[in-house]
Amino acid sequence: MAFPEPKPRGPELPQKRVKTLDCGQGAVRAVRFNVDGNYCLTCGSDKTLKLWNPLRGTLLRTYSGHGYEVLDAAGSFDNSSLCSGGGDKAVVLWDVASGQVVRKFRGHAGKVNTVQFNEEATVILSGSIDSSIRCWDCRSRRPEPVQTLDEARDGISSVKVSDHEVLAGYTGHKNQEYKLDCCLSERDTHVVSCSEDGKVYFWDLVEGALALALPVGPGVVQSLAYHPTEPCLLTAMGGGVQCWREEAYEAEGGSS
């Protein structure tokens, strides 16, 4: 008689707060992991972009150059460059090591909500409230975009460089007044979304059922980022960023 195969263990979801960063940049508009998950970027309403080691809570560098609040940022795949966009309608290319502005791209008619590099970090894609996506050549000195996509009928809130498709819609979280993030967990088993009710919602990707409503705090969870390979979640609320891990995780030196 053959025994049945054991049921695969389900993924562990981050439910334990292990670190809180007081970012000191006014309201944190976005938080983003770098490509390997060792560092994160925070975008502030005080016009700054900051680079952190999130598990240690260490501030590594502050980037100043925007004329208004910073709304999104992304790192290149080789960790040498950053790009950011903000309320000043500008897209900024940064050198990570020196903290200097390499290029400023202008052309959007409204605030820039979202930015992404292509895989080679030769092109920046930016999405704006002006309903356009613009592609900027990082290697050329030409000031105008190499391509403009203006078929959208409303403001662009998110741009992703991917070959994936939209699989399903998930309802239940509250989203009326703010541009809120959503992403996939590190094993692509759950859709994770911010909410205006102070919680982060985890939805089973296949079933579409709510797996977890994680209470973060009394405010709006405006942004989140999921570690690329580990059950580690960053959330942004007010002027701080919270780092969450699975229940079994033991932080070095304890939680703070």
Stretch-by-stretch model annotation:
Residues 3-9, 168-180, 187-189, 198, ...:
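Terminal intrinsically disordered, low-complexity extensions flanking WD-repeat/beta-propeller proteins
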Residues 9-11, 17-23, 59-65, 101-107, ...:
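Short C-terminal beta-strands that terminate individual repeats in beta-propeller domains
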Residues 26-32, 68-75, 110-117, 154-161, ...:
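Canonical WD40 repeat/beta-propeller blade segments in eukaryotic WD-repeat proteins
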Residues 31, 49-52, 91-95, 115, ...:
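WD40-repeat beta-propellers
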Residues 35-36, 77-78, 119-120, 162-163, ...:
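Residue-level detector of Asp-centered blade-edge/turn motifs that repeat once per structural unit
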Residues 42-46, 84-88, 127-130, 194-197, ...:
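Conserved strand-to-loop turn within each blade of WD40 beta-propeller repeats
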Residues 48, 67, 81, 90, ...:
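A conserved positional marker within WD40/Gbeta-like beta-propeller blades
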